[in-house]
Amino acid sequence: MKLCDFEVGLDQPFFLIAGTCVVESEQMTIDTAGRLKEICAKLNVPFIYKSSYDKANRSSGKSFRGLGMDEGLRILGEVKRQLGLPVLTDVHSIDEIEQVASVVDVLQTPAFLCRQTDFIHACARSGKPVNIKKGQFLAPHDMKNVIDKARDAAREAGLSEDRFMACERGVSFGYNNLVSDMRSLAIMRETNAPVVFDATHSVQLPGGQGTSSGGQREFVPVLARAAVATGVAGLFMETHPNPAEAKSDGPNAVPLHRMGALLETLVTLDQAVKRNPLLENDFN
């Protein structure tokens, strides 16, 4: 699959979707994107910057949601203009899609909306690549139906069906907890869509702090290594210059100063894994 200006798939090095959870300010966004660009260029990692203009799904109605759609999109547009980076952001309603698609390179659907047929259809008809997040409540094999919905809508609109990714971000395990089943990454390959692993939301503790979500960022490297060892097309990781002061999802964000070391390890592992065919393909 061609994504932005690079190829993605199990026969290609993993690509990275990374950035702050939410757009907090223009300067921090540009600085963070610039630093990530430097790191990824050094390691030859294809890179898409991500950040949200609005956090529609918050634990508390008093939580910071963002700078607003117009300002958030303007800042993401500056990332493209100043740094020459492709940009991804999530959309939350059908009404937002046209305006968002006019600015960003890749759309993302929130996990909680993966079963909303009209919403998935509308995203698919945008003409943009779409990273479709698997709901925390969904079995991995059920993602085939979700991807098929997107492909059907794209085909009916006369658009390419080869623009959709399936993203794993953990599954609910009791209250305020998520677990990652690495088998899901292999199962989701059966969609014939590139599989992306969200290593930071997978360590989230949803609502675990009462009015906000907690997280266990110390396990991000553990799960990221496991996903790369399993074999994925891409990784999704949120980061922040100072996670303790992040306005959203700080507890599961990778400290920006640690991203280089983490990615260096993951690149080495990815190269080793993709040097040979995946053994599970011959086990049935």
Swiss-Prot record:
The keyword Transferase applies. It is found in: Cytoplasm. It is an enzyme of class 2 (transferase). Keywords: Cytoplasm, Lipopolysaccharide biosynthesis, Transferase. Pathway: Carbohydrate biosynthesis; 3-deoxy-D-manno-octulosonate biosynthesis; 3-deoxy-D-manno-octulosonate from D-ribulose 5-phosphate: step 2/3; Bacterial outer membrane biogenesis; lipopolysaccharide biosynthesis. The keyword Transferase applies. GO terms for cellular component: cytoplasm. One of its GO terms (molecular function) is 3-deoxy-8-phosphooctulonate synthase activity. Signal peptide: none annotated. SUPFAM superfamilies: Aldolase (SSF51569). It catalyses: D-arabinose 5-phosphate + phosphoenolpyruvate + H2O = 3-deoxy-alpha-D-manno-2-octulosonate-8-phosphate + phosphate. Its EC number is 2.5.1.55. One of its GO terms (biological process) is keto-3-deoxy-D-manno-octulosonic acid biosynthetic process. Pfam families: DAHP_synth_1 (PF00793). Belongs to the KdsA family. This is 2-dehydro-3-deoxyphosphooctonate aldolase. It comes from Burkholderia vietnamiensis (strain G4 / LMG 22486).
